[in-house]
A protein has these predicted regions:
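Mobile "lid/hinge" segments at catalytic clefts and subdomain interfaces of large enzymes
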Residues: 151-267, 457-555
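Glycine-rich, flexible beta-strand/loop modules in the N-terminal catalytic cores of phosphate-handling
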Residues: 24, 36-121, 126-128, 133, ...
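Flexible, glycine/charged-enriched surface loops at secondary-structure junctions
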Residues: 114-120, 155-157, 224-242, 273-274, ...
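Single-stranded RNA-binding regions, centering on S1/OB-family and related RNA-binding modules
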Residues: 560-562, 571-716
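Long, basic N-terminal domains or extensions that often function
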Residues: 2-243
Length: 716
């Protein structure tokens, strides 16, 4: 009996195409991952990303948040490589993968229903990588399309684009070569009407250029939104009904009516601890009054607190009043210090209200650069920024754990903000690491990290091109569309506000932006307003607080930092410096105590705790690669005598011949009549003959010396 085989058909297969920034974009549905709620294979150029979305059948019990997870998986087969790990498998997501997951999460999360509690998983797998076509953009588009055509409740779709700035011109989705010279890298995600996410790194770009880039991306995103809307109309599934999160509106209305005055009094303070203590005391009053009538009220307390506080904060802000009494354009009290820690290479303490960040800078040799094994073009990082957020910073008793996605994201934002002002390796041959320790948190810790890190780098003697400061902008909107923006948001304003628009930069321009939203997006008017008020604020922070603390980078690196010398040799002579089996360089390291790194282009970096060791190592290398200059005078030692002349060593292990006719002004019969082994003499380098031998002249050297002495010149 023969085996029966039936050819598999894909009756639900659909393909949609458009051109995006001059390259083909294809969305395929119905062929892969059919058991997911929806799956879209996005191919942009030769980049392919499979985007799958799934949702649980019922809500998760006992939670008051939306359980969304987003994973961006970097597969090394996408770039034709095998992982370098022991088992040759991809491990945990790298930093770039985590950051991309956050970039996908931030624009889609606010577009889910506020009372939706079903688990939702978004998984984007990079299966083919074309460095000219961003997998991040492909994943954003694919996620938007998958959610839009799925049966999962969601208020999309969105479109996504990157914008670069090359030779003063805005470029959509710049390719690999353009990105290398671009002064701007901004990712913009939009719905059909508003902007829902901005993530930017820039080389001190002015507000007008940044605004034009965002505006251009928002306009171009409408083409993607239109394509996905077409997909929804043709193959979209009806959205499923879900149990709405339980909420006791009757009890909440009673609490608001009876406790509004007490709640306002509790909120009206600039001290986070006082506010929380007052609120907890008021909750006890709720219990005393309502527990008998509503025995299940405890399950609603967190949501009651959130909604009640938001009601107060929103009303106050729309009236121009803030919980700590500040004006909308007023920054909390600031202070800045440097040299806080005695033995580190550089340190800066930046305090803004109850937010306090201690940043520490460390300098090391270039061998300490972080090596990267990812799908991206970047293979190493010379400047690294790490952000730590311990429990004690918010008064919580919890154990220390490895950095989470939030810590990695905040560290990357500060890193991106400062990278444009870090000196090039040719001017400052150090690997640089900054660690920002959040020791107290009441909002805007990432921006405090940027300010503190600028102080630490300047204290460490890193010659940054300009100081960088960061500030955040918040937003409250009324039901009629009117809005209020306010500067320097603290924790309670971040929690209950609708926007955290973080902008970092110098007085010249922007270096980084990160925008988080809790609403359905921003109009261009709000974005323009946020850019303007954050510029004014960061200039004040620089002029009034940071620059009076330390006006410019210290002229020298810390005495505890390694001393560095950079030199260049002919790449063909690298083997002479290294020696057979590394014998020569190992001897130099042993004699000098210095650490030596050699690049393939002949660049050599020498590092040591003291300058003397660096000088010893440099001299050893100089001696090895020494090439004399024709016509130059050298003071050398006679090492051998022959019948036809004397060999004079003009550098360690390097000698040349002074022919007998060149040993004296007059004729001599024997070499011994002019010199003996061990004598020191001046010689002039005459030539390298056809056999590579060095020819020297004592006679010509003395003639030149006498002429210089007669002219009053000093011989060195």
């Amino acid at each position: 009996m023969s085996t029966i085989i039936t050819k598999r058909q894909f009756p639900n297969y659909h393909k949609y195409t458009m051109e995006l920034a001059g390259r083909p974009l294809t969305l395929e549905v119905g062929k892969l991952a059919e058991l997911a709620n929806a799956a879209v294979m996005v191919t942009y150029g030769e980049t392919s990303v499979l985007c799958c979305v799934t949702a649980s059948a019922r809500p998760r019990d006992g939670i008051d948040f939306f359980p969304l997870s987003v994973d961006f998986e970097e597969k090394l087969y996408s770039v034709g490589r095998i992982p370098g790990s022991f088992n040759r498998r991809e491990g945990r997501p790298g930093e770039k993968g985590i950051l991309t997951s956050r970039v996908i999460d931030r624009p889609i999360r606010p577009l889910f229903p506020s009372d939706f509690r079903n688990d939702v998983s978004v998984m984007c797998t990079v299966m083919s990588m074309d460095h000219d076509c961003s997998p991040e953009i492909a994943a954003l588009i694919g996620t938007s399309a998958a959610l839009a055509i799925s049966d999962i409740p969601w208020n999309g779709p969105v479109g996504a684009l990157k914008v670069g700035l090359v030779d003063g011109e805005l470029v959509l989705n710049p390719n690999s070569e353009q990105r290398k010279v671009s002064d701007l890298d901004v990712t913009v995600v939009s719905t059909g009407k508003k902007v829902v996410m901005i993530e930017a790194g820039a080389n001190q770009v002015d507000n007008d250029t940044m605004y034009r880039a965002i505006q251009l991306a928002h306009q171009e995103n409408q083409k993607q939104v239109a394509l996905i809307n077409q997909m929804v109309s043709e193959i979209g599934k009806p959205k499923f009904d879900y149990p709405h999160a339980d909420f006791n509106q009757e009890l909440f209305d009673k609490i608001v009516h009876d406790f509004m005055d007490e709640a306002k009094a509790a909120m009206d303070t600039d001290d986070k601890n006082v506010r929380e203590a007052r609120w907890n005391e008021m909750i006890q009053h709720w219990h005393e009054k309502y527990l008998e009538e509503y025995p299940d009220m405890d399950q609603y307390l967190e949501e009651f607190t959130y909604k009640f506080q938001k009601k107060i904060v929103k009303a106050w802000l729309l009236e121009g009043h803030r919980v700590d009494g500040r004006q909308k354009n007023e920054i909390r009290p600031l202070s800045a210090e440097v040299g806080v820690l005695p033995r580190v290479h550089g340190s800066g303490l930046f305090t803004r209200g109850q937010t306090q960040v201690l940043s520490v800078a460390t300098l090391d040799t270039l061998s300490a650069c972080q090596k990267l094994d990812t799908i991206w073009e970047e293979t190493e990082k010379r400047y690294m920024h790490h952000y730590n957020f311990p429990g004690y910073s918010v008064g919580e008793a919890k154990p220390a754990r490895s950095p989470g996605r939030r810590e990695i994201g905040h560290g990357a934002l500060a890193e991106r903000a400062l990278l444009p002002v870090i000196p090039p390796v040719e001017e400052f041959p150090y690997a640089i690491r900054v660690v920002s320790e959040v020791v107290s948190s009441n909002g805007s810790t990432s921006q405090g990290s940027i300010c503190g890190s600028t102080l630490a780098l300047m204290d460490a003697g890193v010659p940054i091109s300009a100081p960088v400061a960061g500030i955040s902008c918040g937003l409250i909107q009324d039901d009629d569309g009117s809005f209020t923006t306010f500067i320097d948001i603290q924790g309670v304003e971040d929690f209950h506000g609708e926007m955290d628009f973080k902008v970092a930069g110098t007085k010249k321009g922007i270096t980084a932006i990160q925008m988080d939203l809790k609403n359905d997006g921003l109009t261009m008017e709000i974005i323009r307003n946020a850019l303007d008020i954050t510029y004014d604020a960061r200039c004040q922070i620089l002029d009034q607080i940071m620059l009076p603390c330390i006006a410019e980078p210290r002229p020298e690196v810390s005495k505890y930092a390694p001393k560095m010398i950079t030199m260049h040799i002919d790449p063909d002579r690298i083997r002479e410096v290294i020696g057979k089996g590394g014998s020569v360089i190992q001897k130099i390291v042993a004699e000098s105590g210095a650490k030596i790194d050699i690049d393939d282009d002949g660049t050599i970096h020498i590092a040591s705790p003291d300058a003397e060791s660096c000088a010893i190592a440099k001299k050893c290398i100089d001696d090895i690669v020494f090439v004399p200059e024709v016509g130059k005078l050298y003071y050398g030692r006679v090492v051998r005598l022959m019948t036809f002349g004397a060999f004079v060593e003009i550098a360690p292990g390097k000698d040349g011949l002074v022919h007998i006719s060149k040993l004296a002004d007059k004729r001599i019969e024997k070499v011994e009549d002019a010199c003996k082994v061990g004598d020191m003499m001046w010689v002039k380098f005459m030539e390298i003959d056809e056999k590579g031998r060095w020819n020297l002249s004592h006679k010509d050297a003395m003639k030149e010396i006498r002429a210089k002495e007669a002219a009053g010149e000093k011989i060195q």
